[in-house]
Amino acid sequence: MSTLTSTQAGTVAVIGAGPVGLAAAAHLLERGLTPVVLESGDGPGAAIGQWGHIRLFSPWRYDIDAAARRLLEPAGWTAPDPDRLPTGAELIDDYLAPLARALGEHVRYGTRVTGVARFELDKTTTVDRDGRPYLLRTVDDEGRRQDVVADAVIDASGVWGRSNPLGAHGLPAAGEEAGAPWLAGPLPDVLGKDRARFSGKRTLVVGAGHSAANTLLLLAELAETEPDTTVTWAIRGRDASKVYGGGAADALPARGTIGTRLKALVESGAVELVTGFTIDAFSADADGSVAVEAKTEGRAVELEVDQIAAATGFRPDLDLLREIRLDLDAVVEAPAKIAPLIDPNFHSCGTVPAHGEADLAHPDEGFYIAGVKSYGRAPTFLLATGYEQVRSIAAALAGDREAADRVELDLPETGVCSSERALDATGIIEAEEDAGCCGTAAPAEEPATAPARGLATGVLHGRAGRRIELPQAQSGGCCG
C-alpha cells in the first residue's frame, strides 16, 4: 500500500542529494520555488562516499556551486582553498554536508525513487497531458511505499551503481554475478580498507578511463611494498593513448599527471597491459581465484587472477523513467541536443559548448535529467557543467527565460573541440569532403562550431581514433 504526499504549488522534486542535486535545490530556493530532494542514501553524496579516498582532478574553485555558496556563507561557512584538490570524502565533509544541513527539511534521506510519471496518466496518453503534475513513486529503507506529487522534476541521480558489464557485446559474461567475491568495484580503496584484499594478489583491472587509471596507480604503489602483488590492465582498444591523455596539455594538471604516471608504469613493466581484450566467461576456482576466459586481438586466452577491478564505465538507470516521454540520443543515452557534443566515439577533449535548460528539455515539459546522468554513457562530465545546467533549469522553471538562456558557466573558454558528430551535424565534414580544393566555401556568417568551455584533456579525438581538423582559410593554394 502506498500513501500520497501532496506538495504546495511551485514544488520541484529533485532526485539525488549529490553535488548537482543539492545545487539544484539551492537555485530553486533562491528563485522562490520549493525543492524536495529525494535521496536513497542516508546522507548527502552517498555515491561519492564510496570513493571518498580518491582525489578529484578539479580544484575547489570548480567544485562549489554559486547559489550553494550564497546560501552557506551568511551562516559562517568558509570555502576551502580554491586551488586545492579535494578528495571525495572532503567534498562531502567540507561542502555537501554543510549544504544539506542548510537545506534542512527540503532533503529526505532513505527515499529511493522507483518510478516517475505524469499524475494519473501513462506514457501513451496525450489528452490533458500538458500542465499535469508529476508523480514520483518512492520506497523507504523499510520497504514502505509513498507517492510524491511535484510540478516539475530534475533527475540528478547520477550513474553510480550502474556499471557497464565486463563481458563482450555490452552484456554480462557467463559467471559475472553481482557480489562475486573476486569482483571489486571500479574504485576500491587499495591502500586503505581494502588493502588486505589486494596485497600479494594477482589483480586484473578492466577499463580505459580515469577510474581504471587511479586504481592501477594505487595497485602499483601497493606492489612496491607487498611482494607477489601483480597488476594486469586489460582494455578493449588496441592502444592506451587515450587513457594516457594529453599530459602537459591537460588543463587539469592532476588529470594529465595520472596518464603520464600510468604510461611510465606500463613501459617499466610494473603494470602489464593487454590490448584488444574481450571477456567471454568467468570460472571461479575452489581457492577463491577466478579463471578469465577471454580473447586478445582475436586469440583465445585464459588468465588466472585473484581480484578483478571492473572500471568499465557507467550507464544511466532509465528504468524509473519508462513512463516519461524522453528525447534521448540512441548512442549515448543523453539528451539528444547535447549528445553529438559528448559522444566518446569522437570526442574526448573534456570541453563542451555551454548548454542549459533549452538543450536539456524533453517532450514532457518540466522534466529534466541533469548532472552526470545527463551525459548518459559519455565520461567527460565536470561538476561545473552540472551546476550551470541546474542554474538554467531553475531560472526557466521560475519563468526567467532571459536568465535561463544566459551562459554563466565559470570554466575557461577553450575554443572548438573537434567532435566528428558535431561537425557532421553542422555540415562541416560534408562540405570538406564534397567541396574539393576549389569548392564553394561555407558562408562566413555560419560558424563551424560553437566555442566550447571546459578543462581540456589535451586529447582531441575519441574512440574512433581520428583527429578531425577544422577547415581553415587558405591563402593562395591551388586556386591562387
Residues covered by each model-derived region:
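Glycine-rich dinucleotide-binding loop and its adjacent helix/turn
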Residues: 4-5, 88, 155-225, 231, ...
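N-terminal Rossmann-like FAD-binding beta1-loop-alpha1 element of flavoenzymes
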Residues: 10-36, 212-222
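Residues at the starts of beta-strands that form the adenosine-phosphate
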Residues: 11, 34, 202, 227-230, ...
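Conserved Rossmann-like nucleotide-cofactor binding loop
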Residues: 20, 43, 160, 211, ...
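Glycine-rich active-site loop/strand segments that organize a redox cofactor
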Residues: 43-94, 186-192, 233-253, 365
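Feature captures the FAD/FMN-dependent oxidoreductase FAD-binding
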Residues: 78-152, 156-161, 280-290, 304-307
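A Rossmann-like FAD-binding core segment of flavoenzymes
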Residues: 115, 138, 220-330, 395, ...
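C-terminal, flexible cofactor-proximal segment of oxidoreductases
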Residues: 315, 330-480
